[in-house]
A protein has these predicted regions:
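Surface-exposed, interaction-prone regions used to assemble/regulate multi-protein complexes
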Residues: 2-231
Length: 231
């Protein structure tokens, strides 16, 4: 009997990236409720869960025996900045739109990198450089630890196609260092603080504002509200 791990049982929320949708049995509503019920235990990381880091590219990683640390360019803030530049006709170099957030997962077990085949089977591989954060699942929570599965994208050289990998870890503590506010100030100064605070207010709620279209709508909404208030 094979003792291979399978994505369908390890992290079914991530399975659609690897297997046919018809094979997946997962109650998303129940999972969302699970996240809400464990909000205090998840701490600051909780507000970013369920796809809010999707497409955030990896700035840096650090792995040792008791830590997995990754710094991302927060895609949601990046997209909102892009929307502000478009709406307000600003001349800002796109390469400057870097909004770092550092995720430190303290752990006392091995962090594993895994390939996933067409049947969902996981095969552990050597750690590799990650390029883009795609998704995550909180697999289990108790008083001592939180078990996670993450999907990342890796781009290869020499015309080799990119590939998705699954990273598994068990965290005893999570430390989040948000540096987006400082980056925003360096790029925009204080001219668009009201827009930025409005964006963060809705980002911190259950409202989805993590794509370009939604961010453009949010800016229009703020302008309309401001006009009504000043009338």
């Amino acid at each position: 009997m094979s003792n291979k791990k399978n994505i369908l049982t390890v992290a079914p929320f991530l399975a659609e990236d690897f297997v046919e949708a018809s094979e997946i049995v997962f109650d998303v509503d129940q999972y969302q409720q699970f996240i809400r019920e464990n909000k205090q235990r998840l701490g600051l990381f909780g507000k970013y869960l369920i796809c809010k880091f999707h497409d955030s590219w990896v700035i840096d990683t650090n792995i040792n025996d008791n830590l997995f640390s990754i710094t991302l360019n927060d895609f949601s803030t990046h997209v909102f900045a892009d929307a502000i530049i478009e709406k307000k006709n600003l001349n800002v170099n796109h390469d400057k739109l870097v909004f770092p957030i550092q995720l430190d997962f303290k752990t006392n077990t091995k962090v594993t990198f895994n390939e996933v085949d067409d049947y969902g089977n996981l095969t552990e591989i050597e750690p590799l450089k990650l390029d883009e954060y795609l998704n995550e699942q909180v697999v289990s929570i108790d008083n001592d630890k939180i078990e996670f599965a993450f999907t990342f994208w890796k781009t290869f050289q020499d015309d080799k196609p990119g590939q998705k990998f699954v990273l598994l870890l068990i965290a005893t503590e999570i430390i989040i260092s948000e540096r987006q506010d400082l980056a925003w100030q360096k790029i925009f100064g204080s001219d668009f603080d009201n827009y930025y605070h409005y964006f963060k207010q809705h980002f911190d709620s259950d409202r989805y504002v993590s794509d370009q279209h939604k961010c453009l709508e949010l800016i229009d909404e703020y302008d309309t509200t401001k006009s009504s208030t000043n009338a």
